[in-house]
A protein has these predicted regions:
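Noncatalytic, beta-rich nucleic-acid-contacting surfaces in large DNA/RNA-processing enzymes
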Residues: 1-428
């Protein structure tokens, strides 16, 4: 299919998504974000990747399953419109589905933290939405269109078939791939790889053919420079557990009630024992009072910090840093930088212009903080210097927001059907 036709198809799908999500009129903020991202896709020629995402998302919806896209593309308007209706990237806002009223109140990063309200024009209950996912960190991902997918074990074969059929219609083959894992001392399934037009598994060089942990014939993608277009696919236990709860309880994800009180949800979420040790420890330590704060804590658990004297191999998680580094703990207590968005906002409050704040945030969050002390002290509070000088990687908010939503869903299952939850999770 010519690129122009794929782009028109993408526009058509997005327009239907906008009409479905905003039935009383599309807010200007949503239209601006959509048009901006569409221009990036048109310039980069990556429309096909978004159409494939839509096909996979629709297949998951038909199977009453969910998928997760773990990189920065998760926080884009295009992904939200094309099938993943979890993370609206706009600022926290109210929207009236009856008359189209739209407003972005101050003081909340996540729309679910806004108090219930009625439309001042027509009196109908307002929809609360938005996760404040800045486009500064998603623009490059939009242009690359580099999707990775997390599936449940049950949906994994279906997802692979959708990918295979998508490329077969375009005269190309998508075949299984595997990657060498030093930690396991073996090849492990990596997902799929899209072969050049006219090539099949039989015509690929024998040096690239290996067997994965299941014994299946795969293309070796350990050296990405030697193979074309790998698609990273991963199985995740979290989605397996969610599907089991949905199946055993008879309550679909889409049928779960409106979010309950934050206090109840946090207690139930910790009681599920689904968050890992570090996530539970940080949640108990910080005692988040809002849904947005819960999500920020989960985002912070994705961050990496340098261990002084440990070389480039050994990195600490936030939990580990807080355990042994007293100076870091004091800095974090006063300036709890959970995510790149949080650091960007702090720099803006300290007087940085937008361009300078983004430049510094990118340098710090990638572990490239190599400015001299005088330069650092010019832009950062002194108690933040220790913290920022040792950041190896600082995550965006999207992963924590997505994971937080799934944990909150599971907490609602525990709250609504506790016996089913205990039976599915722990067999009791």
């Amino acid at each position: 299919m010519p690129m122009e036709d794929m782009l028109e198809m993408l526009k058509s799908c997005c327009r239907r998504g906008l009409e479905r999500l905003y039935p009383a009129g599309v807010p200007p903020a949503a239209m601006r974000r959509y048009r901006h991202e569409l221009e990036l896709v048109e310039r980069a020629g990556t429309a096909e990747e978004y159409l494939l995402f839509r096909e996979i998302s629709k297949a998951a919806e038909r199977a009453f399953s969910k998928i997760y896209v773990p990189n920065s593309v998760q926080g884009t308007m295009l992904v939200y419109l094309l099938g993943d209706h979890d993370l609206n990237p706009l600022s926290a806002h109210y929207y009236c589905t009856a008359c189209g009223y739209y407003t972005e109140p101050k003081g909340a990063a996540v729309g679910l933290d806004l108090p219930p309200a009625d439309c001042p024009h027509c009196g109908k209950p307002l929809r609360r939405d938005g996760f404040s996912l800045r486009r500064q960190w998603s623009d490059s991902a939009v242009e690359m269109g580099a999707f990775s997918y997390w599936f449940s074990n049950g949906f994994y074969p279906t997802g692979c078939r959708v990918i295979e059929q998508h490329y077969r219609k375009r005269g190309r083959r998508a075949v299984p791939s595997a990657c060498w894992r030093d930690s396991a001392d073996r090849y492990e399934s990596h997902g799929m790889v899209v072969l050049p037009r006219g090539r099949t598994m039989d015509t690929m060089p024998e040096t690239l053919k290996i067997r994965d942990e299941f014994g299946g014939l795969c293309i070796d993608v350990t050296d990405l420079d030697k193979v074309p277009v790998p698609l990273s696919l991963r199985r995740t236990e979290l989605l397996d557990r969610m599907e089991a709860l949905q199946r055993e309880s008879g309550i679909l994800f889409s049928e779960l009630p409106v979010i309950l009180s934050t206090r109840t949800l946090l207690q139930d979420m910790l009681a599920t024992d689904i968050p890992d040790k570090e996530q539970r420890a940080l949640l108990r330590r910080q005692k988040p009072a809002t849904i947005g704060a819960i999500m920020d804590c989960l985002t912070a658990c994705c961050n990496l910090y340098e261990r002084p004297g440990g070389g480039n191999i050994r990195h600490d998680s936030l939990y580990e840093k807080l355990q042994w580094d007293e100076q870091f703990a004091r800095s974090f207590a006063e300036y709890p930088v959970y995510s790149r968005e949080a650091l960007y906002a702090l720099l803006r409050r300290e007087g940085c212009c937008r361009e300078r704040a983004f430049e510094l945030t990118e340098s710090i969050r990638r572990g490239w903080w190599c400015f001299d002390p005088e330069q650092r002290e010019q832009w950062l509070p002194k108690k933040l210097l220790w913290q920022c000088a040792r950041i190896v990687y600082l995550s965006g908010r999207a992963p924590g927001c997505w994971r937080g939503l799934q944990y909150l869903r599971m907490a609602q299952y525990l709250h609504l059907v506790p016996q089913t939850f205990y039976r599915v999770m722990w067999g009791v």
